[in-house]
Amino acid sequence: MFRGANAISLDAKGRLAMPSRYRDELVSRCAGQLIVTIDAVDPCLTVYPLPEWELIEAKLRELPSLREETRRLQRLLIGNAVDLELDGNGRFLIPPRLREYAKLDKRAMLVGQLNKFQLWDEDAWNAMAEADLAAIKQPGGLPDELRDLIL
């Protein structure tokens, strides 16, 4: 399980180091093989361990292919998916096209989302986190079924 928000740096080539607290789990679960693609909802990238991504692909394959919404989602997620592998130093390279999409420069946030990560530009993450906190504090900011989850 991946949790927590981690400030990380991208080097001039677009490489970033996976925080050490996740490396062993990623090596044991998927031999360091990852998939990165755009996030279909948020202005960030999503990084999946390969087995998790294969589950997503299986679900996408089962959707009705004649629906425009299905094809649109498949184009966005599968069409932008890139295979990555952690190198010996725990680094991986984000392709330029995906860095541009997420507006990644030197400072980023790798955010654990249980079975995957989101990769955000640091400023965009901070703005989103503030907006999310403000939204849930508003009356009606959380649906009733989610209120029961808050401890």
Curated annotation (Swiss-Prot):
InterPro entries: MraZ (IPR003444), MraZ_C (IPR035644), MraZ_dom (IPR020603), MraZ_N (IPR035642), MraZ_sf (IPR038619), SpoVT-AbrB_dom (IPR007159), SpoVT-AbrB_sf (IPR037914). It is found in: Cytoplasm, Nucleoid. GO terms for cellular component: cytoplasm; nucleoid. Its main location: cytoplasm. Gene3D superfamilies: Transcriptional regulator MraZ domain. GO terms for biological process: negative regulation of DNA-templated transcription initiation. Keywords: Cytoplasm, DNA-binding, Repeat, Transcription, Transcription regulation. Residues 5-52, 81-124 form the SpoVT-AbrB domain. GO terms for molecular function: DNA-binding transcription factor activity; transcription cis-regulatory region binding. Belongs to the MraZ family. Forms oligomers. NCBIfam families: division/cell wall cluster transcriptional repressor MraZ. This is Transcriptional regulator MraZ. It comes from Pseudomonas aeruginosa (strain ATCC 15692 / DSM 22644 / CIP 104116 / JCM 14847 / LMG 12228 / 1C / PRS 101 / PAO1).
